Regions:
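Acidic, contiguous N-terminal accessory segments
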Residues: 159-270, 274-296
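Solvent-exposed loop and beta-edge segments used for protein-protein assembly and interaction
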Residues: 27, 38-40, 93-95, 130-134, ...
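Feature activates predominantly on carbohydrate-active enzymes
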Residues: 248-363
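Surface-exposed loop/turn motifs at beta-strand-loop junctions within extracellular Ig-like
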Residues: 50-52, 140-146, 268
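Short beta-strand/loop motifs in extracellular/secreted proteins, especially
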Residues: 1, 42, 108-110, 335
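Aromatic, loop-rich ligand-recognition surfaces of beta-strand-rich domains
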Residues: 1-14, 27-73
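Beta-rich interaction/scaffold domains
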Residues: 72-167
Length: 363
């Protein structure tokens, strides 16, 4: 049969000629027809039927629906499309720099919901490959075009190939908390703790955290480091304010441990500061030498912290400072102090002139 229409000028045109598919002893009783091009029509009709009949015409049309947008393929549902994506586990080759979106049936759309490691797969689909192979969990949002309904997929595992391959028998990743995200070493050499005498930094913004690091390092090791602004040099911890790549972020950093120096780089002072905490923890693991190797480190979770209830029992300010300093050591970034359960409005705070009248604030 033909699908014909009357356009806005009153002219009759053929939109599509269609031949139905045999099914059993007859033909499919539900068909979806997609036009090659969009049309604007005042009227639409089916005509020029070619019927198969023994003694009578046997064509009947129960219902015809016309849509201005693509409809889902028969048999495809929002749930089935989501399940199909969840069933896929993929490997992203080392030469791929943009995430390939899943293919979905006509009538559905899909967009990236996010990855657990945004420092490897960014919100825009940009990929920065890790040092060695790493599993990244990715989620999508699938939308049914006809209804506008959407559904998130579960996390789908993607193996993102690394830029390097770790060989057996080389230096192991330092043990720190939280675990270093990426590590690579092609060496068995070490750098002696005693050989590191200086700290350099490239930007005045780093001075405060460098001074804190010098103080902390002396507390940990007994070694008094000399800090100075300038470029990287041998026998030194060298801190640089620059972006190692597009996705590492303010809290991420790279560390290159060489035979005669340790270089740390981050786009922000925070990342450099976290690199310093890693060095302090590395000393706790081995107080004589550091393993030569490279790391690319970053947090998995944006907020990492806890609530400290200091309302039930008084806690000294020094104690709270010690708690927050320990948090920094473990790269935690969110501290909330619960000070009081008193339900007192601000304007009633000073209602009583004397200390023994404090409870008047509740009145």
């Amino acid at each position: 049969f033909d699908i014909k229409y009357i356009d806005k000028n009153g002219e009759e045109k053929t939109a599509k000629s269609f031949t139905n598919t045999k099914q059993g002893e007859g033909y499919k009783n539900e068909v979806v027809i997609r036009l090659d091009q969009p049309i604007e029509a005042k009227e639409l009709k089916l005509c020029n039927f070619v019927a198969e009949a023994a003694e009578w015409n046997n064509i009947g049309i129960l219902e015809m629906e016309v849509y201005s947008n693509d409809q889902a393929e028969q048999g495809a549902t929002l749930d089935s499309v989501v399940e199909a994506i969840e069933a896929e586990s993929k490997t992203i080759a080392a030469d791929v720099d943009t995430l390939e979106m899943p293919v979905v049936p006509a009538g559905f759309s899909v967009k990236l919901n996010g990855a657990d490691f945004e420092q490897i797969i960014g919100d825009n689909g940009k990929i920065v490959h890790p040092l060695t192979d790493k599993t990244v969990k990715v989620s999508y949002v699938v939308t049914e075009t006809a209804t506008g309904k959407g559904k998130e997929t579960k996390d789908v595992d993607y193996i993102v190939k690394g830029t390097k391959t770790q060989a057996d028998g080389k230096n192991a990743k330092p043990t720190v908390i939280p675990e270093i995200q990426e590590w690579y070493s092609d060496s068995t050499e070490k750098i002696a703790v005693s050989s590191l005498k200086t700290v350099t930094y490239t930007d005045d913004k780093l001075k405060d955290v460098v001074d804190e690091f010098v103080s902390d390092y002396e507390d940990f090791t007994g070694i008094k480091l000399t800090a100075k602004k300038g470029g990287a040099e041998a026998n030194a911890f060298n801190f640089e304010l620059k972006a190692p790549d597009e996705l590492l972020g303010e809290e991420g950093y790279t560390m290159d441990i060489q035979k005669d120096r340790i270089n740390v780089a981050s786009v922000d002072t925070t990342g450099n500061m976290y690199g310093m905490q890693t060095i302090l923890q590395m000393y706790k693991e081995n107080n004589e030498r550091y393993n030569v190797g490279q790391m690319r480190d970053y947090p998995r979770f944006e907020t990492r912290g806890f609530l400290f209830d200091v309302a039930r029992k008084p806690v000294s300010l020094e104690m709270m400072k010690e708690v927050t300093r320990t948090m920094r050591y473990y790269k935690m970034n969110d501290f909330q102090a619960h000070l009081s359960d008193n339900y007192i409005f601000l304007e009633d705070y000073g209602k009583g002139a004397q200390e023994n009248e404090a409870f008047k604030a509740y009145e």
